[in-house]
From Swiss-Prot:
Class of the enzyme per the UniProt entry, highest EC level: isomerase
PANTHER family noted in UniProt: PSEUDOURIDINE SYNTHASE, PSEUDOURIDINE SYNTHASE FAMILY PROTEIN-RELATED
Lineage: Bacteria, Pseudomonadati, Aquificota, Aquificia, Aquificales
PROSITE patterns: PSI_RSU (PS01149), S4 (PS50889)
SUPFAM superfamilies per UniProt: Alpha-L RNA-binding motif, Pseudouridine synthase
Family statement drawn from the similarity comment of this UniProt entry: Belongs to the pseudouridine synthase RsuA family.
Protein name per its UniProtKB record: Uncharacterized RNA pseudouridine synthase aq_554
UniProt KW keywords: Isomerase, RNA-binding
Entry keyword Phosphoprotein: no
Assigned EC number: 5.4.99.-
Organism for this UniProt entry: Aquifex aeolicus (strain VF5)
Amino acid sequence: MRLDKYLSKSLHISRKEAKELIREGRVKVSGKVVKQAEYRVKEGEEVEVEGKSVKPKKNVYLMLYKPKGYLSTTEEDKKYPSFLELIREHFPSRKLFSAGRLDVDAEGLLLITDDGELAHRLTHPKWKVEKEYIVRLDRDIGDEELKKLYEVKLEEKPVQLVKAEKLSGDTVKAILTEGRHHVVKRLFKAVGHNVVYLKRTRVGNLRLDENMEPGEWRELTEEEVKELKRLVKYNPQN
């Protein structure tokens, strides 16, 4: 693993901050100062920062069922609390954030982590990671309106809609590969419908547990994490 990445994972700082420590000569590998951020830390080598031995901590990966009324950002406002209020006491020293946003009046799956690279890849348009939603509308939607969803453009760019399947008269399962602000609501608004209920049920291969209640969370299994990384070709050893 590169030295700057090793420090980033050990100290939970940015790669930029890690490079600054290295450049200033505050980092030793096996007793010798190393000033190359790209230096590969080998198995068995000890890394020290200002005389203190450091080792990468295991990242946190959580599935959270975000309830309505909670922000998917780490900043709170006067009206709504952050999702962090639901998990903070269990991870007091971790800088956790959500991989992607979910409207404050929506509920469903939030992937919570401190793995910045994975979060970045899962939300980057390049990787086309699918997000699945259950959408209930203010009235029944017709087949022609459903077809028109595939033609909708926002800011002159087509919405990346993979599939829109009618589950009942007023309920649609929508799968998108993008996360623009209020994209689901704006998509349906473009064909004359208001969204009255929105729930995210899947991100990539990760599906919200059926027995999970709003506000509940669990850690992802090793296999679930591996599958997410495989989906976006993320090899943390690089």
